[in-house]
Amino acid sequence: MVNPAMESDSPHLRGSLVVFEGIDGTGKSTQVELLARYLRSRGIEVVTGFEPTRGPWGMRVREAAMAGDRLSIDEEIACLLQDRREHVREVIEPSLQAGKWVLLDRYYLSMMAYQGASGANVEEIREWNEAFATVPDVALWLDIPIELSQERMHARGNGKDAFENEKFLSDCAAIYSAMEMPWLHRVEADGTVDEVHAQIREIIQEELGI
């Protein structure tokens, strides 16, 4: 397990890793950008990203899901783990060691929820990831009702992918709800964008002093 609090070898103080989690339609990408803007206004260097990435391993999962024909669960897990290994090695850890904050739209908690809802063992997924992946300083679970999630996805006008049926999203939400990590915080995300951002700012202030 990579300790998020470990000291960097660089002259910079180590940055912080903040990840945004939740089912589709919760507004994660919007809140990533709002927090990034706030942190930059405080003079903090910020790197934003998302998972699965646009690298070859992440795109295999994305393209199969958008085609409505998911990979097998074993193939998904293998691709997602390799995608994350490269992301940690090439982007996340170098940025943190340089003193930058990293904000991610999805991380390995999504894998626990989504592949867990597909039948994989949730705790095994956590163990596989934490064997190499940086543990977040703060994870923000943006929680909304399933009905609102589907309304928002419909309003976006994007075609449904293989992960977006109501029963599956309900199972994912149940797994998120059962997660117990001291750095995981639930955010009620069915309010306005500004209301959700205010909750996030409060958590970041309490946990990271910013």
Label each region the model flagged.
Residues V2-P11, A36, E147-I210:
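NTP-dependent small-molecule kinase module
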Residues Q31:
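Hydrophobic positions on the alpha1 helix immediately C-terminal to the Walker A/P-loop
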Residues I23:
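P-loop (Walker A) phosphate-binding loop of NTP-binding proteins
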Residues L13-L17:
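Pre-Walker A (Motif I) flank of P-loop NTPase domains
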Residues K28:
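Conserved lysine of the Walker
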